[in-house]
């Protein structure tokens, strides 16, 4: 955050991200997108749609959708095909994450590109892969 802001780049964050970084003593983004506070909220910036589906892999998951290009930026709530586990769940809610992933599977069937938080970009199959990893973890 500090590096970006020192270059004159505005950093925007979910309200919970600001709270968590403050509590952790980390660099705090200076802009909060207050409209994303509630699960299910969406904010549009031109053709870009930012949305907060709720707690998942992290409590402050923010995702982005470019409908014209059908690209979903899922962040850490979407696992790459190389991932064989759900990863670190210390700051997340796996039950909510499963519900979010099921919703994403229904809502973004038209996605031609899905960008996970880590690993290779893929397509819609990353959403079903993520759902399977979570379901397997909960067994």
Language-model features: locations:
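Repeat-unit-sized solenoid/scaffold elements
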Residues: 30, 81-83, 87, 135-139
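Short, surface-exposed linear patches
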Residues: 10-13, 33-35, 55, 72-73, ...
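Metal-dependent catalytic neighborhoods of phosphoester/phosphodiester hydrolases
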Residues: 1-7, 124-129
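Short, electropositive alpha-helical surface patch
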Residues: 15, 124-139
């Amino acid at each position: 955050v500090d590096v970006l802001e020192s270059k004159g780049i505005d950093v925007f964050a979910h309200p919970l991200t600001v709270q968590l970084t403050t509590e952790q003593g980390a660099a705090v983004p200076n802009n909060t997108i207050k409209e994303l506070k509630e699960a299910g909220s969406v904010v549009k910036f031109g053709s870009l749609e930012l949305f907060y589906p709720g707690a998942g892999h992290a409590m402050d998951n923010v995702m982005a959708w470019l409908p014209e290009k059908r690209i979903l930026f899922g962040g850490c709530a979407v696992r790459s095909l190389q991932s064989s586990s759900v990863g670190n769940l210390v700051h997340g809610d796996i039950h909510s994450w499963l519900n979010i992933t099921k919703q994403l599977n229904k809502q973004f069937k038209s996605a031609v590109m899905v960008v996970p938080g880590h690993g290779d970009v893929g397509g819609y199959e990353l959403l079903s892969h993520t759902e399977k990893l979570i379901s397997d973890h909960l067994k």
